[in-house]
UniProtKB/Swiss-Prot annotation:
Reported induction: Repressed by the transcriptional regulator EthR.
Record gene name: ethA
Enzymatic class: oxidoreductase
Organism placement in taxonomy: Bacteria, Bacillati, Actinomycetota, Actinomycetes, Mycobacteriales
Record's protein name: FAD-containing monooxygenase EthA
Keyword field contains Membrane: yes
């Protein structure tokens, strides 16, 4: 007999742990399992193993709302973040619900039975289980393959070419010349870490620059409050301080982009040698927050540049050579190792497909509702975090809403909920109003968002608190239904 559960959660990273905790806390009678395709939990924090891996936002907002972050670092390294996620799962018994090596291949919705059949591959064997509600918490990255553009002459290079998503544990880079291609969060994390841990010299080669902000890796206010207040109270206070600060910076960038650009470049200039061409190497041709700001703790990247361990080169690649990279300017960069920190590939729902009564779902024709459900797909929610703030802020809100939704359905005898696509008064817009390369490459494969609430993705935690945490469940956009009574009853 096929196993049946009330809820199936896909993914055992931060989003999956949040979903499970909220289910246990707010829907304690619901049975559930977490399906994780990898051999261990932690998602991003277990997958990425490159030197220097760390958070790119503070842990008081990246941490769960329900469990305080107690580490000393506000900008934390990957290992303690992974331990935090794992220990949270163990503390609340969530780890007992995780089924590892369970890759979801497809999910089929039956209107007649009001349930999903989830098809799974585990150790080469196919199986299935059914559930009332499907909660997709696998993020939007392709965990199997990062983005690596084709570079002319790459076959000529005699050294290793490595993508950070697949970092070899035995890579020896001591006293080596390294070129890191890229300018995003991965590159600005890797470059100073490599320079400080044995590399002879590191070059960050970028086609165009990114806005970079330096921030202390410790929070002085948090340290004081932790001495004066109970743990949970101190954590909540610092969390709100940082939420409001993030919102204020983002709002200022939207209102006064030129002024904020000038301020960011001025702050960078103070940390670099006199005469350094900040505009060329750290002055993007777009406004702040059109793409995510990159964070460097304690100015580590700028310190490495000052000490001569790191050089930033802004140029384009002609081809790889046997001993490095030839640029279109004619310059050649010597390299023993080349690292392609060139981005990620987007992949919603872990690559799983969905059908409704045998008909394939084309998610590109759907519209997102509150950034967590898709039009026309019954009894399904997904978690995608913020692009301009910590991922977990949105993950916790989505988990809260799903629990409120399930309880509302139980209280009113409903078996299904589906998002109805709005009429022509709501204009279609791209799923993300965000322009990094990994998003632009995949926009045609993503759902749409709408021009107004609740179809518009706010990217605003304060607005989402009103909309998601405090808003009505039975509002515009959702249609609830009860299973028809059997004939003769």
């Amino acid at each position: 007999m096929t196993e049946h559960l009330d809820v199936v959660i896909v993914g055992a990273g931060i989003s999956g742990v949040s979903a499970a905790w909220h289910l246990q806390d707010r829907c304690p009678t619901k049975s559930y399992a977490i399906l994780e395709k990898r051999e261990s939990m932690g998602g991003t924090w277990d997958l990425f193993r490159y030197p220097g891996i760390r958070s790119d936002s503070d842990m008081y907002t990246l941490g769960f709302r329900f469990r305080p972050w107690t580490g000393r670092q506000a900008i934390a390294d990957g290992k303690p973040i992974l331990e935090y996620v794992k220990s949270t799962a163990a503390m609340y018994g969530i780890d007992r619900h995780i089924r590892f090596h369970h890759k979801v291949i497809s999910a089929d919705w039956s209107t007649a039975e009001n349930r999903w059949t989830v098809h799974i591959q585990s150790h080469g064997t196919l199986s299935a289980l059914t559930c009332e509600f499907l909660f997709l918490c696998s993020g939007y990255y392709n965990y199997d393959e990062g983005y690596s553009p084709r570079f002319a002459g790459s076959e000529d290079f005699v050294g290793p070419i490595i993508h950070p998503q697949h970092w070899p544990e035995d890579l020896d880079y001591d006293a080596k010349n390294i070129v890191v291609i890229g300018s995003g969060a991965t590159a600005v994390t890797l470059v100073p870490a490599l320079a400080d841990s044995g590399a002879k010299h590191v070059t960050m080669l970028q086609r165009s620059p990114t806005y970079i902000v330096s921030q202390p890796d410790r929070d002085g206010i948090a340290e004081k409050l932790n001495r004066w207040l109970p743990e949970t109270m101190a954590y909540t206070a610092v969390r709100w301080k940082n939420v409001l600060r993030q919102a204020a910076v983002y709002s200022a960038c939207q209102k006064w982009p030129r002024r904020m650009r000038k301020m960011f470049l001025s702050l960078i200039q103070r940390q670099l040698p006199e005469g350094y061409d900040v505009r060329k190497h750290f002055g993007p041709h777009y406004n702040p927050w059109d793409q995510r700001l990159c964070l460097v703790p304690n100015g580590d990247l700028f310190r490495a540049i000052r000490h001569g361990k790191v050089e930033v080169v802004t140029d384009t690649i002609e081809r790889f050579t046997a001993t490095g990279i030839r640029l279109n300017s004619g310059r050649e960069l010597p390299a023993d190792i080349i690292i392609t920190a060139t981005g990620l590939n987007l992949q919603l729902f872990g690559g799983a497909t969905a059908t409704i009564d045998g008909q394939q779902v084309d998610i590109t024709t759907t519209m997102a509702y509150k950034g967590m459900m898709l039009s026309g797909i019954p009894n399904m929610a997904y978690t995608v975090g913020y692009t301009n703030a910590s991922w977990t802020l949105k993950a916790d809100l989505v988990s809260e809403f799903v629990c409120r939704l399930l309880n509302y359905m139980d209280d009113n005898g409903f078996d299904t909920v589906v998002v109805e696509r709005p009429g022509s008064d709501v204009e279609e817009r791209p799923f993300m109003e965000f322009t990094p390369g990994y998003v632009l490459r995949s926009l045609d494969e993503l759902p749409k968002q709408g021009s107004r609430t609740p179809w518009r993705l706010n990217q605003n935690y304060l607005r989402d608190i009103r909309l998601i945490r405090r808003g009505k469940i039975d509002d515009e956009g959702l249609r609830f239904a009860k299973r028809p009574a059997p004939v003769g009853v």
